[in-house]
C-alpha cells in the first residue's frame, strides 16, 4: 500500500515537473543523464590506444564534478574542503551552469580529433544540458532543483481567495 503511494507521488511529481516548461528542471534531469554518460562512457573509452584515453579520463573527471554541481546535498554527506564547496556553489545560476556544460561539451567533442567514439553521445547530452540552462536563464527562470532529487521542486502559487 505504502509502495504504491510513494510510486504514485513520484510519478505525479516527476510528470508535473516535466509539464512545467521550466528549462532549469529539464536541464537538471539532462545533467543527471550527463553524469551517467560521462562516467560510463569515460570508463568504456579508457581502453583505446590513441589519445582518446586522455579525453576519457577528462570525461570521468567531468562526471565527478557534475555530481557535486547537480546534487549539492552530496557535498554535505561527503567530506569536501571549503574551497571545493565554494567552487561548486559558484554554479548556482543558470548561466554559469550552462557555461560549464558548454565547456565540458567542447572538451568532450575535441576527442573526435583523434577518433570518433561513443564520447560523442556524451558531448551531445552535455550541449543539450547547457542549452536548457541557457534557455532558463534567458527566460528569467530561477534555478530550481527537482523535488524528485531532493530539491524544492516547482512551486505552484494559489491565487489568494477574494472575499465578497
Swiss-Prot record:
Q: Report how it sits in the membrane.
A: Multi-pass membrane protein
- Which Gene Ontology terms of cellular component type are present? Golgi apparatus; Golgi membrane
Q: Keyword set for this entry?
A: Glycoprotein, Golgi apparatus, Membrane, Transmembrane, Transmembrane helix
Segments crossing the lipid bilayer: 35-55, 57-77, 100-120, 123-143
* Family matches, as InterPro entries: TVP18/Ca-channel_flower
**Coarse class of the protein's main subcellular location:** Golgi
Q: Per the UniProt entry, what are the Gene Ontology biological process annotations, in alphabetical order?
A: endocytosis; vesicle-mediated transport
- Glycosylation positions in this chain: 22
Query: Which family is this protein grouped under?
Result: Belongs to the TVP18 family.
The entry's function note states:
Golgi membrane protein involved in vesicular trafficking.
This one is known as Golgi apparatus membrane protein tvp18
Provide the gene name from the record: tvp18
